[in-house]
Amino acid sequence: MKNLRIWSLLCLIWMGVLAASAQDTGKEKISLGDAMPAITLNSEIYGKVTPADLKGKVVLVSLFATWCGPCQIELAEVQKTLWPKYKDNKDFKLLVIGREHTDAELKKYNERKKFSFPLYPDPKR
């Protein structure tokens, strides 16, 4: 009986590994050092950001979620140290992107956090 449980557990784990490795999101994988993919961000609050807006600029991209603890620490640090130093630099662009969040959700979130940098939605991730 004990051997049957062990084999059953191993089979379940193996099936999970196979299922996870078989998933293909159809999205191109990005590696460190690759060029940034051409993205367009649309915000009812902050407007549209296109690849042309980013050309020739240093771009810092921060992907976050409102429920993510480490993200909250990172964004607070960006607000405190990085944003005041670079916000007026025409060659710098900060893209803080709320994954799976809408403009309305980000607006409500920012009413609490009081960040002075733009938050762009990515509701469809």
Range-by-range predicted roles:
Residues 8-17:
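Bacterial N-terminal signal peptides
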Residues 1-6:
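Positively charged n-region of N-terminal signal peptides that target proteins for export
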Residues 57-58, 73-97, 111:
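Conserved helix-turn-beta segment immediately C-terminal to the redox Cys motif
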Residues 18-38:
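N-proximal helix/coil linker or "cap" segments that precede and/or mark the start of modular domains
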Residues 104-107:
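Acidic helix N-cap motif at the loop->helix transition within catalytic regions
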Residues 57-59, 64-67:
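Short pre-active-site segment immediately N-terminal to redox-active cysteine/selenocysteine motifs
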Residues 110-125:
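Short, internal strand/loop/helix patches
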Residues 38-59:
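A short beta-strand-turn-helix
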